């Protein structure tokens, strides 16, 4: 019986230990990190979806709906195209000698002069747009033996007939149209753009009535190039009461070169030249209104902020713009891995460290300490490790923007039907570039997110190791991000651990003494299990012995009779 009582006592000791941290001679210190109830999912190299405490959207998916007029100089074409303004269509005279960073063409733009075509329309439009000016210099061309300043009722300038202000329509004088041969040297130090044309009458009668000869010819040349155009006489669809046409051509004369014009009819002569400039001006088709505001990036949909590295508003852009990508969203992690805090902590509200979960409500830092000692419980952030992580993360967004935002413009591409295959090839190249950039963007963000999560995890581990090195043998790692401190550690002591001034030698003797005393009573879970099993086995054995003894005693007294048959 004494043995049973002794074993029962040991069993009670094994199960009746005090909870860690409840002894006034010890304390518990846990390390943890910030957490939020609902984090943001981001993509990394190793995970398609991983939850973080905070993330920043990198794709701009909407515009302001208006074009800002600052810092770029915006020229609203209103109802004029750039080429009409270049030629001097009467209703576009307000654009003479204008300059711009971005010329905005509207869908309502129309021509209101002699019907014309430009065989290389896209190139001329792009050339003039990039020059950023319609500055025109009149030159004294001498046209002998012909009538100048021809006009048409299809091109009204005021009440009377008119013509393009930058072109001079030459017709016969009397009954003759002599061969014209005019030269104009470029003695300046800049390129000169000459616009000229060829008239295509609708009938042979119109041809001879204007130019005498049954067929004219126009040749314009420089030392670098030559163009010879033969008029195509024939009826075309009626436009503004005319079935004849004018074809517009252009020639660039370099400094030191000479412009030579030779013709025996059908010449639409230049009146001077446009001064060419090099720059990054451009043109854009858009119906977005122009407003007084500031934006570096402009799309046909309107201006967009350029504080993000990517956008999927429009492929066509002007200014310092985010790269166009196909994704609607790409999120950059700007916080750490999120592990929401568990609502229950077991018996008596025990605290836990970062290995189990994060801590919600820690608003003054990303990393911190929680403690439980004789004075109660408390929490404080570790600002040094928090700042170290923030400093490295803050530069990520700016670095991504610097890598992707460039001051360039993606212009619209136009090709004639003859160049359909070139257009298809160009579209394929553009689509491939977008696919490549979209893939690169996703990969770049995934890499940065992986680095951010690894970085924040590393800072947590650094703080834990720093605390471990301070405490040394004065505390025991509990395996969940917490330390059990084997000496009395009040709030001042806890603060010294947090700020790195803790002196473990001061508490060493007390910690060792308490550790031995506690270990003498506390039984580790492994030994406790062994003792429980041994106690159970011995108790069962003694119970069997007592039962067997009772049976033998009863048999001797005759109370029980046992017959054995063979």
UniProtKB/Swiss-Prot annotation:
Site entry: Cleavage: 345-346
Single biological process term from Gene Ontology: viral budding from plasma membrane
A cellular component annotation (GO) from this entry: viral envelope
Matching InterPro entries: Capsid_hemagglutn, Hemagglutn_HA1_a/b_dom_sf, Hemagglutn_influenz_A, Hemagglutn_influenz_A/B
Segments on the Cytoplasmic face: 552-566
Principal subcellular localization: virion
Compartments reported by the entry: Virion membrane; Host apical cell membrane
GO MF: host cell surface receptor binding
Modified how: Palmitoylated. In natural infection, inactive HA is matured into HA1 and HA2 outside the cell by one or more trypsin-like, arginine-specific endoprotease secreted by the bronchial epithelial cells. One identified protease that may be involved in this process is secreted in lungs by club cells.
Key word Signal present: yes
Lipidation (S-palmitoyl cysteine): 555, 562, 565
HAMAP family reported for this sequence: INFV_HEMA
Function recorded in the entry: Binds to sialic acid-containing receptors on the cell surface, bringing about the attachment of the virus particle to the cell. This attachment induces virion internalization either through clathrin-dependent endocytosis or through clathrin- and caveolin-independent pathway. Plays a major role in the determination of host range restriction and virulence. Class I viral fusion protein. Responsible for penetration of the virus into the cell cytoplasm by mediating the fusion of the membrane of the endocytosed virus particle with the endosomal membrane.
Name listed for the protein in its UniProt record: Hemagglutinin
Organism: Influenza A virus (strain A/Hong Kong/1/1968 H3N2)
């Amino acid at each position: 019986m004494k043995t049973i009582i002794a074993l029962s006592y040991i069993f009670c000791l094994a199960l009746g230990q005090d909870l860690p941290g409840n002894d006034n001679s010890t304390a518990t210190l846990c390390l943890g990190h910030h957490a939020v109830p609902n984090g943001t999912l981001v993509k990394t190299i190793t995970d398609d979806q991983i939850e973080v405490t905070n993330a920043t959207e990198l794709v701009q998916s909407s515009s302001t709906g208006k074009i800002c007029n600052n810092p770029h100089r915006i020229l609203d074409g209103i109802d004029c195209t750039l080429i009409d303004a270049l030629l001097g269509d009467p209703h576009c005279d307000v654009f003479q000698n204008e300059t711009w960073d971005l010329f905005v063409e509207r869908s309502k733009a129309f021509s209101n002069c002699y019907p014309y075509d430009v065989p290389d329309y896209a190139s001329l439009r792009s050339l003039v747009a990039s020059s950023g000016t319609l500055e025109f210099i009149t030159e004294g061309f001498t046209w002998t033996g012909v009538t100048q300043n021809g006009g048409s009722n299809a091109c009204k300038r005021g009440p009377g007939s008119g013509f393009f202000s930058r072109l001079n329509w030459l017709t016969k004088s009397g009954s003759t149209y002599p061969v014209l041969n005019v030269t104009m040297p470029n003695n300046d130090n800049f390129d000169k753009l000459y616009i000229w044309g060829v008239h295509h009458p609708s009938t042979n009668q119109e041809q001879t009535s204007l130019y005498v000869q049954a067929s004219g010819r126009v040749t314009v040349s420089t030392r670098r190039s030559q163009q010879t155009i033969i008029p195509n006489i024939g009826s075309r669809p009626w436009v503004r009461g005319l079935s004849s046409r004018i074809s517009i051509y252009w020639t660039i004369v370099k400094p030191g070169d000479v412009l030579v014009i030779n013709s025996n009819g059908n010449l639409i002569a230049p009146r001077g030249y446009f001064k060419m400039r090099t720059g990054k001006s451009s043109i854009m088709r858009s119906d977005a209104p122009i407003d007084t505001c500031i934006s570096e990036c402009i799309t046909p949909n309107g201006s967009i902020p350029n504080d993000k590295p990517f956008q999927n508003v429009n492929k066509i852009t002007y200014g310092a713009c985010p790269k166009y990508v196909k994704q609607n969203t790409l999120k950059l992690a700007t916080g750490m891995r999120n592990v929401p805090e568990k609502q229950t902590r077991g018996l008596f509200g025990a605290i836990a460290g970062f290995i189990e979960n994060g801590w919600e409500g820690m608003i003054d830092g990303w990393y911190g300490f929680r403690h439980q000692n004789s004075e109660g419980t408390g929490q404080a952030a570790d600002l040094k490790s928090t700042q170290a992580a923030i400093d490295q993360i803050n530069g990520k967004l700016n670095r991504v923007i610097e890598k992707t935002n460039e001051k360039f413009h993606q212009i619209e591409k136009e090709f004639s039907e003859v160049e359909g295959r070139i257009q298809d090839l160009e579209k394929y190249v553009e689509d491939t570039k977008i696919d490549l950039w979209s893939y690169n963007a996703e990969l770049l963000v995934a890499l940065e997110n992986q680095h951010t999560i690894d970085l924040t995890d590393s800072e947590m581990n650094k703080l834990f190791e720093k605390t471990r090195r301070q405490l040394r043998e004065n505390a025991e790692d509990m395996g969940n991000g917490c330390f059990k401190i084997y000496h009395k550690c009040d709030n001042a002591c806890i603060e010294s651990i947090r700020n790195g001034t803790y002196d473990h030698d001061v508490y060493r003797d007390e910690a060792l003494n308490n550790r031995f005393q506690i270990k003498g009573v506390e039984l580790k879970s492994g030994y406790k299990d062994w003792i429980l099993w041994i106690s159970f086995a011995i108790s069962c054995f003694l119970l069997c012995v007592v039962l067997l003894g009772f049976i033998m005693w009863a048999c001797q007294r005759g109370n029980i009779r046992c017959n054995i048959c063979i």
